[in-house]
């Protein structure tokens, strides 16, 4: 059965960032909102790609804690767990998940900052993408974890601007 697309519309507010730091805002938000993350830029002097991001309040996502199970999270729904038959199928399942979201076009190019998944894949997630096999072991963190956030705060360090993007 084909699932109905989940429509997302992103609103963007631009502010001067000269009195804010990504770490300062993150520290104020992390205990108030679940799943808050900070991805900080290392180069604040380069004009391109000099951004830091704070994701606040996950509304969807994917989590893989073992080589045989994947969990999908959708806005306002209970998480859904599914078995992974072959580890090489996981990237296609992640792609299929992402295709279930339809982003409404925005007049502000910065809306794209909130219209994707933020997360990570650990070293132990290599079997999902290659033929390498590892000895099974207990992982203390998920092998892969990606989230769609209700709010993404994007800092443009080069221009001293911040964008509050809301889905």
Can you annotate each of these PLM segments?
Residues 2-167:
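Signature of the chorismate-utilizing enzyme
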């Amino acid at each position: 059965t084909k699932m109905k697309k989940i429509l997302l519309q992103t609103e963007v507010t631009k502010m001067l960032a000269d009195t804010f730091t990504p770490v300062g805002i993150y520290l104020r938000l992390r205990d108030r909102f679940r799943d808050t993350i900070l991805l900080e830029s290392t180069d604040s002097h380069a004009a391109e790609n000099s951004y830091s991001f704070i994701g606040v309040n996950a509304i969807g996502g994917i989590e893989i804690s073992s080589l045989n199970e994947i969990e999908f999270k959708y806005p306002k729904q209970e998480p859904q767990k599914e078995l992974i038959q072959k580890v090489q199928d996981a990237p296609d399942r992640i792609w299929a998940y992402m295709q279930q979201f339809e982003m409404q076009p925005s007049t502000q190019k910065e809306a794209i900052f909130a219209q994707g998944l933020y997360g990570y894949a650990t070293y132990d997630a290599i079997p999902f993408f290659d033929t390498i096999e590892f000895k099974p072991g207990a992982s203390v963190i998920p092998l892969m974890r990606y989230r769609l956030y209700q709010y993404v705060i994007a800092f443009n360090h080069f221009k001293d601007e911040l964008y509050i993007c809301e889905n």
